[in-house]
């Protein structure tokens, strides 16, 4: 795997930044916050995050054993851990960036069951311990780009999805992979209340083409900053597809199903003109209500240090993934 030329270790989103808000912006859902433009709301959240000293501390997750393959290390500046764990989108726990950190402690992640089914020869069921022990774990420093035009650099820990799928032996009929988040309204207030959860239909679902799922970059993620994922970041296991917008990174996964047909995805169902199935990071294809040409990188500095930078095609991973979409109109298939 070629070392990513766009990432330097100094670019990684610091540990304190990675972990917190995204408001509901879909006019079709009839939620009052939907009138807000996502970038404006997201930047307001950035201001509230940086202006005070009341940021929640980075959670103390269980330390993990993992390797650091050279191919996945780089010199990008990391987003601090407290920002990674305190500034994020997980509508099942509320719309504000700080809501997941404040409310996700109610999520019970052990015991846990992850089922792999559908067009496979050998259906599998993994428990909580399997997620960190069945496959060798490795740290990968990835860029993360939100559709709201902000970004981070994060040292995720996990294993390639293709290793898990290989155990299940996809059949020749398998063309897509469908993912589903846990449905637990008693633990997730956004699944109980339409207003709290942004008017989305739950459980949250996502999907990839099989070749995307099998790509070496696609990561089943169980940790960050050397420790197990905190609940607000999608514990105990989430998906990271670094060349796609962050909403493709489904959290707290309980089901992976291989299918013949393209599966439904939550944001595409909610607003098909705004959120496509592919959701590849593309500076040349704007969201209908804001530009995707630039992004705000969340690093270790304060609000005055947050700078706009050019958005990279496929989030800087074009050398690795552009061939997946050869001949595909990226404007039509956004």
Swiss-Prot record:
GO term, biological process aspect, one: protein repair
Highest taxon listed in the record's lineage: Bacteria
Cofactor comment: Binds 1 Mo-molybdopterin (Mo-MPT) cofactor per subunit.
One Gene Ontology CC term in the entry: periplasmic space
Cofactors (names): Mo-molybdopterin
Annotated compartments: Periplasm
Known catalytic reactions: L-methionyl-[protein] + a quinone + H2O = L-methionyl-(S)-S-oxide-[protein] + a quinol; L-methionyl-[protein] + a quinone + H2O = L-methionyl-(R)-S-oxide-[protein] + a quinol
Any matching Pfam family: Oxidored_molyb
NCBIfam families named in the record: PRK05363.1 (NF003767)
Protein name: Protein-methionine-sulfoxide reductase catalytic subunit MsrP
Gene source species: Escherichia coli O17:K52:H18 (strain UMN026 / ExPEC)
Upper taxonomic lineage: Bacteria, Pseudomonadati, Pseudomonadota, Gammaproteobacteria, Enterobacterales
